[in-house]
Amino acid sequence: MAHTAAAKKQSEPKMSRALVRQETIAGYLFLLPSLIFFIGFVIYPMVMCIFTSFFDSSMNRADVFIGLQNYVELFHDSVFLGALRNTLIIVVVSVPITCIFSLWVASAIVNMPPWATSLFRVIFYLPVVTGSVAVTVVWKWMFNNYYGIFNSLGKSMGLIDQNINWLGDTRYALACIILILLTTSVGQPIVLYVSALGNVDQSLVEAAEVDGATKLQAFWKIKWPQIMPTTLYILVITTINSFQCFALIQLLTSGGPNHSTDTIMYYIYYTAFKLYRYGYGNAMGVILAIMIAVLSAVQFKVTRSD
């Protein structure tokens, strides 16, 4: 009897190890399709992008290794430098405005009745779920220099004397792009901030107000630390989206007038698929990826230290 019990105890670890091994193999098998997809459509293109950026790669001739020449040419290319400047302007203007406006709106609607909060969340989120092409076409009509609503309102209010070609004038085109980007990018941050503010411990806020804290002090000392992770996420996502601004440019201005709305993303597309200079376009892609990674790391460092 004792021998049987001992044998049973010895067999249990073996069965446990076999079961764990089977579960591990099954887990890897379930993971395999996603892993193959990730390697094939993310890792491989990234590696090839970096690799071909060191070549003079074109559709019309064989690839020629040129080392860092593409990168050197980038910083002597006036069109690229203009696109870099425009991209940075879009990021510097749109990211803070998006975050501040979204937090302000969320703070205003989070304390409304539940039905009102839900209604405003849907209203602000509509541009996100609506196709970007459809939204862009509507804005293009509104900015039309013949029958657009902005020219009609401007003349009726006495602000302008004649129609303005908003998207065809170098003075206004980039500002119009930023305005459209702002209206289409605040929906998700508002929804996220409403959720984050709704999860703030109100007992702490009430206790602070009882102790004499103002609403601003209560927000800064109690609410802000609790919504910091959400703010970090919004900062990073908004920054990436601003750097990757492409559809608006493609559909509204094609980089014009006179390259005044060129962005790095659009210039990559134009160089690779219009001029067929794949190596040069990939070099721009590498620079863009480095810029996004560095800025995201800085944002993460600053917000974490706060």
Locate the predicted segments by residue.
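Short, Lys/Arg-rich, polar N-terminal cytosolic tail immediately upstream
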Residues: 1-21
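A structural signal for multi-pass alpha-helical bundles of membrane permease subunits
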Residues: 22-306
